[in-house]
């Protein structure tokens, strides 16, 4: 769910306001504008994205949840020299520091090209410098499809999101990432500590004027693994992820992504959150987050 400086958690009131279910955009020169997306592409610079208050995270009113910028990295990765018949199989995101609610520059390039696999590097920067970076493996799809033993193919499912009601993330922020997505718990709850099974759906596109891709939806959802399976009191502890790794053996179908998530804390202050990922038809992959655990101060 992103990084924030230890001891830097601010509890000042958010400056957001609601207007027809949307949030104000927070970019110099755009104050008062309302948003129906997490980012807007700058018309003057296609690599520059204006952040809206829907990106705000739980640790500070001035920092983004890592889900939207991770999805933004996925957005530019998929648009970097796209190749028919290839698919992203893994994305590893490094969170270099708090991502400010400010304009961001996103760039991607192929650093290793090949006939069957290629490596893409993407960077997200604010005016202060790089804040996130990602490496993605793009793999060639088998054509025709391989004839594999059916007993070894991934199977299993989770009850569908229609089996439960939406649950609101507990936050003192009026508008943020928690108002831009929908959570539906099959097991666990924000009010109950421990493992959880939770369906997540984006209410808005990552970038205005575009439809969220399966990769964008997965990256945005997967960064909530440590949040839905929290084992510590939010008011007493920080458990902030320094990274997010998502491996997909197939693309999700539909708008919902399910996390079967568990958090493993250690007394020395390092933890791991891991999630089995599903869509409405079955397994799609896994995600992990390395956690920095510390008392609030």
Per-segment meaning from a language model:
Residues 25-297:
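Terminal targeting signals and extreme-terminal segments of soluble enzymes
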């Amino acid at each position: 769910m992103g990084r924030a400086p230890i001891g830097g958690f601010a509890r000042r009131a958010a400056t957001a306001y609601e207007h027809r279910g949307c949030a104000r955009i927070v970019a110099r020169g755009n104050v008062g504008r309302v948003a129906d997306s997490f980012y807007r592409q700058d018309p003057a610079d296609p690599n520059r994205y204006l952040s809206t208050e829907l990106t705000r995270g739980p640790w500070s009113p001035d920092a983004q949840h890592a889900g939207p910028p991770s999805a933004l990295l996925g957005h530019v990765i998929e648009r970097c020299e796209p190749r028919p018949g290839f698919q992203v199989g893994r994305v590893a995101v490094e969170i270099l520091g708090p991502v400010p609610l400010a304009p961001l520059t996103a760039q991607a390039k192929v650093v290793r090209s090949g006939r069957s696999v290629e490596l893409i590097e993407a960077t997200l920067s604010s005016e202060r410098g790089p804040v996130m970076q990602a490496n993605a493996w793009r793999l060639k799809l088998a054509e025709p499809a391989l004839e594999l033993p059916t007993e070894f193919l991934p199977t299993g499912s989770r009850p569908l999101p229609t089996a439960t009601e939406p649950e609101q993330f507990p936050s003192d922020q009026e508008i943020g990432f928690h108002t831009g997505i929908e959570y539906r718990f099959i097991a666990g709850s924000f009010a109950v500590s421990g493992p959880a099974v939770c369906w997540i759906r984006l209410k808005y596109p990552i970038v205005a004027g575009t439809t969220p891709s399966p990769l964008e939806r997965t990256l945005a959802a997967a960064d909530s693994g440590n949040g839905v399976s929290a084992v510590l009191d939010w008011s007493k502890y920080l458990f902030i992820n320094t990274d997010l790794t998502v491996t997909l053996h197939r693309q999700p179908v539909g708008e919902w992504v399910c996390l079967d998530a568990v958090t493993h804390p250690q007394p020395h202050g390092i933890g791991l959150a891991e999630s089995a990922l599903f869509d409405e038809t079955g397994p799609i992959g896994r995600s992990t987050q390395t956690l920095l655990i510390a008392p609030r101060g």
